[in-house]
């Protein structure tokens, strides 16, 4: 059976690999198709498409939009756009707006850190960023500059920039679920709720209903929760049960299924771990064609 992976990240957001490196890795894993779904970025999609030509692998153009909604007390709700037109101006403008807001948030965090005595400048940190600018970039900069103070990136988060810590600031770089779905549809794409199992089950089911009521097309049923979400405390068998549960939800509601391993890099290798049949992509394409 041919397999695919419809959630992959590159250096255009918070992944470790260049587009070319990700394609090579997917080929090594024997995948038939992968989707490039960087967080609030489409910067690697065309590079991957061009490199993959004549190499026997399909590239699905995509994006993972950072959304939220006042009805749900989650830090972020990820919405995948698959088969999107990366040249769509409205989608590009929305992504530009999100990243502008994100940069402003990071400037304010850095000002707080400077006020606490840390020698850090926005432009110095930004220079090392290839994709979207996140708190991990600030943490890596501080770890490199102050190795005697911090033991790891996680240590920087725990002491300074994690939620509720001295230099943390709420970000306003989210769009509403409704606007995210509209932007994806406007770019000719299919809107998928990413990894619904990361939320408490009761809230997850409410979120799925809300997402679908606002025009969403389906949910990500295949996902390696046992690898990416240790806080769930499930093993491989438990993950299989999670997948079955969300597949049953998709079937009951007659909506699309998608699946991705959320690969970011070698620090947490997941590409191709969950076997996702090619038929999943065929079904998504069929729905898009309607």
Please place each PLM-identified region on the residue numbering.
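S-adenosyl-L-methionine-dependent methyltransferase catalytic core, i.e., the SAM/SAH-binding region
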Residues: 136, 148-161
């Amino acid at each position: 059976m041919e397999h695919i992976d419809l959630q992959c990240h590159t250096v255009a957001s918070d992944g470790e690999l260049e587009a070319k490196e990700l394609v090579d890795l997917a080929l090594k894993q024997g995948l038939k198709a992968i989707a490039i779904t960087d967080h609030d970025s489409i910067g690697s999609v065309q590079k991957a498409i061009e490199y993959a030509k004549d190499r026997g692998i399909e590239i699905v153009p995509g994006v993972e939009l950072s959304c939220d909604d006042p009805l749900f007390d989650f830090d972020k709700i990820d919405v995948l756009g698959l088969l999107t037109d990366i040249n769509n101006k409205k989608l590009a403008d929305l992504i530009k707006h999100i990243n502008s807001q994100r940069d402003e948030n990071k400037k304010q965090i850095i000002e707080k850190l400077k006020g606490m005595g840390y020698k850090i400048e926005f432009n110095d940190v930004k220079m090392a960023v290839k994709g979207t600018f996140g708190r991990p970039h600030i943490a890596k900069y501080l770890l490199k500059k102050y190795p005697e103070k911090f033991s790891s990136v996680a240590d920087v988060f725990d002491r300074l920039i994690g939620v509720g810590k001295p230099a943390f600031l709420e970000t306003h770089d989210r769009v509403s679920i409704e606007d995210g779905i509209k932007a994806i549809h406007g770019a000719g794409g299919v809107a998928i709720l990413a990894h619904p199992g990361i939320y408490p089950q009761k809230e997850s089911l409410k979120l799925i209903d809300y997402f679908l009521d606002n025009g969403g097309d389906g949910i990500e049923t295949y996902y390696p929760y046992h690898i990416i979400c240790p806080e769930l405390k499930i093993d491989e068998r438990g993950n299989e049960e999670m997948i079955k549960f969300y597949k049953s939800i998709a079937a009951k509601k007659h909506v699309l299924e998608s699946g991705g391993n959320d690969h970011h890099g070698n620090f947490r290798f997941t590409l191709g771990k969950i076997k996702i049949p090619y038929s999943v992509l065929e079904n998504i394409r069929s729905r898009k064609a309607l």
